């Protein structure tokens, strides 16, 4: 629960198999449908760029490459949101952190919820 009330956070690590990861994301979207908003969905989706936002119809809060960690060229890690106000979207502060703990960069988003 945040200062403005309850919100939902979900995380996922989707398959690297093309097509199967999209099916997983669609199933996840259906599962999340009835949960309270605002909702934040984040994780390693193994899907590049804007595909996760298009599949879910959620808002992408991070627009930076995350893979591979030492020279990120493609965004595979995402933070998506549904049910945020325009003000909450506008004030979201996203960052990508190049940490030597994974082959992917870490992603953080500061939200005022």
Where are these regions (language model features)?
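Active-site regions of metal-assisted phosphoester/phosphodiester hydrolases
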Residues: 1-113
